[in-house]
């Protein structure tokens, strides 16, 4: 099972930033992340914990994307590219600056026979 880790470490207004990392072929990859509330998900942060991740078809994006499952009182939470709050409805957005790492992650999830899991950790500094 592929393990993905998200460490949330910085707040700026309502936005929450972090670093998403995963290992592939003994090499660590990292991506900057961004989460922002929306009208549909005012209580938007996924609680810290471990969640299964499946690659499923997204009708909104019209392609396969990672879907985080078993989030309490939430559904449809995905990991996808984005740079502004309007790109998210409570999802984990990946910074486009890390485009090659995003492609590696998505390709790896696509080619995995097993699903992945994500560990979400909070390490905010005062």
Q: Positions of the model-derived regions?
A:
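Cell wall/extracellular polymer interaction/catalysis modules
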Residues: 1-116, 121-126
């Amino acid at each position: 099972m592929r393990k993905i880790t998200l460490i949330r470490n910085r707040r700026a207004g309502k936005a929450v930033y972090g670093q998403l990392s995963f290992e592939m072929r003994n090499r660590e990859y990292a991506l900057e992340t961004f989460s922002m509330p929306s009208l549909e998900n005012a209580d938007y942060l996924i609680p810290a914990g471990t969640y299964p991740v499946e690659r499923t078809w997204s009708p909104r994006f019209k392609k396969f994307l990672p879907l985080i499952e078993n989030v309490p009182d939430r559904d449809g939470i995905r990991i996808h590219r984005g740079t502004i709050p309007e790109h998210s409805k409570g999802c984990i957005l990946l910074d486009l600056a890390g485009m090659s790492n995003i492609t590696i992650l998505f390709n790896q999830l696509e080619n995995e026979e097993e699903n992945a899991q994500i560990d979400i950790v909070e390490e905010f500094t005062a």
